[in-house]
From Swiss-Prot:
Residues with glycosylation annotation: 49, 87, 93, 123, 203, 355, 436, 491
Record InterPro entries: Aldolase_TIM, Glyco_hydro_27, Glyco_hydro_27/36_CS, Glyco_hydro_b, Glycoside_hydrolase_SF, Melibiase_C, Ricin_B-like_lectins, Ricin_B_lectin
SMART domains recorded: RICIN
Origin species: Aspergillus niger (strain ATCC MYA-4892 / CBS 513.88 / FGSC A1513)
Record-annotated disulphide pairs: 46-78, 126-156, 430-444, 469-482
Name by which UniProt lists this protein: Probable alpha-galactosidase A
Annotated localization: Secreted
Gene Ontology terms describing biological process: carbohydrate metabolic process
SUPFAM superfamilies recorded: (Trans)glycosidases, Glycosyl hydrolase domain, Ricin B-like lectins
Family according to the record: Belongs to the glycosyl hydrolase 27 family.
Length: 537
């Protein structure tokens, strides 16, 4: 089958998928809000044992983490024996876990926690232990018998079988696990690591293809590189920023019942400053990403416990709307992100990526607040202080610090239009409006000309020129007066595949000279990030 035919068939398949249906048993109630808890990997890797987990459960129950919502304790790789039993069942390492995993499950449950486990979709785990390939039903039943309700399924040692591409092989294996879990009386939470094995290449097509199907099969997906482990070489902050940047490319996939997972929180990593640790937590909270701590819990400091149990930020993370914060603006120094919250409030998160303190005024119009003569209440979610703002909010941020504000919208001022960057996810370039009605893709520079409003009817207009609308005519794209007779040319739909399709031309926006071309499946030049809250077609 040639690539063109395959693209057409794949696009047709994606068009037929009911994107509101997610999760292992095709219901969002299995995991309506992101999970919170503990995993040993980034801190201890294979150096795990029974005592580590009992001490962790004891500490989390005593120091406020459990009561703050961190109610899951998950094993990672290296928990098992190197051989299955005579009947093919997995066995735990009896030296590391002398009382056994069923006993450990009972122990952590008695402390108020759920218990999760790790396996691999290949014939071996990443650490060289038995994988679940060809043992899926048996292993799922074993885990349930042991008292486990959460499965992280890795993707090491997966090889394409005859007649399948590697992406198709992963889809078959994770799809089979989805079927197995769906038949269980009490399905396990399904954390999929498949996308991580396709991230970071020169072409994102396979990565996005995997991202298209993981939300249908499970509740969360590890989408990119592992966070730096405690003993690893390199910069922990750079590792956090790497995973943060990957996560910003994927907001269109997230909704209640499915969550993008940029990997663990590492609050006791010695390579991080206090501001960097707090930023890590605040950014993941703003994303409504899983909050899974990988640290030596008994030794966490009071300050680390304090920010990890920040009620206001946890409330944002656990907000039932489950929107992922997206870029309102970005330049080389500041990232400004925003999203809606279920009660109608608006979130503002600002990250200083630079190496010096920055002061900036941020117009409320950049945050999607379009009403004039309104006064909003802005609550600082770090210290609880509030201030009244009207046309802008002033931010002062130290290097690598993150500010988070919750904006209350008074009656009569509650109108919000999804607002922010329209950027190509492969190049990172931002759609930019010019004063001569032309548009171009340029490096993101924090200018108002790169900030766009996207209305419910599919109209896209720059905040710098709100009487002008993005329009397509033939192969060209330009700005023209809104509400003109060419309304179809100003109407756009946004798909989960990242395509921005025009109603008049039936083509898709394409980076380059900013033009319309035939819509292709997950092609780099046609995959765009838009503000959260934009309706998917």
């Amino acid at each position: 089958m040639n690539q063109g035919t395959k693209s057409i068939l794949l696009a047709a398949t994606l068009a037929a998928i009911p994107w509101q249906v997610y999760g292992s048993i095709e219901q969002s109630s299995l995991l309506p809000i992101p999970p919170m808890g503990f995993n040993n990997w980034a801190r201890f890797m294979c150096d795990l044992n029974e005592t580590l987990f009992t001490e962790t459960a004891d500490a989390m129950a005593a120091n406020g983490l459990r009561d703050a919502g961190y109610n899951r304790i998950n094993l990672d790789d290296c928990w098992m024996a190197y051989q299955r039993s005579d009947n093919g069942s997995l066995q735990w390492n009896t030296t590391k876990f002398p009382h056994g995993l069923p006993w450990l499950a009972q122990y952590v449950k008695a402390k108020g926690f759920h218990f999760g486990i790790y396996e691999d979709s290949g014939n071996m785990t990443c650490g060289g232990y038995p994988g679940s390939y060809n043992h899926e039903e048996q292993d799922a039943n074993t885990f349930a018998l042991w008292g486990i309700d959460y499965l992280k399924l890795d993707g090491c040692n997966v090889y394409a079988t005859q007649g399948r591409t590697l992406e198709e092989e992963y889809k078959q294996r994770y799809g089979h696990w989805h079927q197995v879990l769906s038949k269980m009386q009490h399905p396990l939470i399904f954390s999929e690591s498949a996308p991580a094995y396709f991230a970071g290449t020169d072409n994102n097509t396979d990565w996005y293809t995997v991202m298209d199907w993981v939300p249908i099969y499970g509740e969360l997906a590890r989408h990119s590189t592992d966070i730096l482990v405690y003993s690893g070489a390199g910069s922990a902050w750079d590792s956090i920023m790497n995973n943060y940047n990957y996560n910003t490319l994927l907001a269109r996939y997230q909704r209640p019942g499915y969550f993008n997972d940029p990997d663990f929180l590492i609050p006791d990593h010695p390579g991080l400053t206090a501001d960097e640790k707090r930023s890590h937590f605040a950014l993941w909270a703003s994303f409504s990403a899983p909050l899974i701590i990988s640290a030596y819990i008994p030794a966490l400091s009071k300050d680390e416990i304090a920010f990890l149990t920040n009620e206001a930020l946890i409330a944002v993370n656990q907000d039932p709307l489950a929107q992922q914060a997206t870029f309102a603006s970005r330049d080389n120094t500041l990232d400004i992100l925003t999203r809606n919250l279920a009660n109608g409030d608006r979130l503002l998160t600002v990250l200083n990526k630079g190496n010096t303190t920055v002061t900036r005024d941020i117009p409320v119009q950049w945050l999607g607040l379009t009403e004039t003569d309104c006064t909003y209440t802005a609550e600082d979610l770090w210290d609880g202080k509030t201030q009244k703002i009207s046309d802008h909010i002033k931010i002062e941020l130290a290097s690598h610090a993150t500010a988070v504000f919750r904006l209350g919208l008074p009656q009569g001022c509650s109108s919000v239009v999804p607002t922010g960057l329209v950027f190509n996810t492969a190049s990172g370039n931002c759609l930019t409006a010019a004063s001569n009605s032309s548009v171009a893709f340029q490096s993101c520079n924090g200018e108002t000309s790169q900030i766009w409003q996207v209305t419910l009817s599919g109209v896209i207009r720059p905040v710098s020129q709100t009487t002008q609308c993005l329009a397509a005519d033939g192969n060209s794209v330009k700005l023209q007066a809104c509400d003109s007779t060419d309304s179809d040319g100003q109407n756009w739909t946004y798909a989960v595949t990242g395509n921005l399709k025009n109603a008049k031309t039936d083509g898709c926006l394409t980076e380059g000279s900013v033009q319309m071309k035939s819509c292709l499946y997950e092609r780099d030049g046609q995959v765009f990030g838009l503000p959260s809250g934009v309706q998917l077609s």
